[in-house]
């Protein structure tokens, strides 16, 4: 059974890389019929649903994981990302804060928290988070682009 689900996960991943998200969802559904509590399948299906802009369904997939693994960093970050997409920046930040309690140097959580802070209007605090992410990985493009954008915004206001 394990080799079948691993094979389906690989197929689904390749389909996602090719932009065939609907076909990938079929693979994830097949996996979840076999292994309903598969962490990887639940998270990856959530990401795929997010790519298709089915945000509330994606959130449900992340909740499935967080119900049994409340400290799953991937599920927490993706939940924050989905909430950010819905404009629920404060809620998103609360998920990033959990990640940062678990891993103070998680550059994705630092950067995403900065993005949510920026969208909430706290540009100076966003800059601090982008800068902290870059102090950990100076080549992290998303943090650098976000930092540059935030600084330009500060100069123009």
Give the positions of each predicted feature.
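Canonical positions in the second alpha-helix
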Residues: 31, 64-65, 98-99, 132-133
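Helix-start (N-cap) detector for alpha-helical repeat units in TPR-like alpha-solenoids
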Residues: 5-6, 39-40, 73-74, 107-108, ...
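Position-specific recognition of the canonical hydrophobic site in helix A of tetratricopeptide repeat
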Residues: 16, 43, 50, 77, ...
């Amino acid at each position: 059974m394990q080799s079948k689900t691993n094979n389906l996960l690989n197929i689904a991943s390749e389909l996602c890389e090719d932009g065939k998200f609907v076909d990938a969802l079929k693979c994830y559904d097949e996996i979840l019929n076999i292994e309903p509590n598969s962490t990887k399948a639940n998270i990856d299906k959530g990401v795929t649903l997010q790519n298709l802009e089915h945000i509330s369904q994606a959130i449900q997939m992340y909740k499935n994981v967080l119900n049994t693994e409340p400290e799953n960093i991937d599920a927490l970050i993706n939940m924050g990302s989905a909430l950010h997409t819905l404009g629920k920046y404060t809620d998103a930040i609360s998920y990033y804060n959990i990640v940062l309690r678990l891993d103070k140097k998680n550059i994705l959580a630092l950067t995403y928290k900065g993005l949510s802070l920026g969208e909430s209007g706290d540009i100076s605090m966003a800059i601090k988070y982008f800068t902290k992410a870059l102090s950990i990985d100076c080549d992290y493009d998303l943090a650098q682009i976000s930092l540059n954008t935030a600084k330009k915004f500060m100069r123009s206001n």
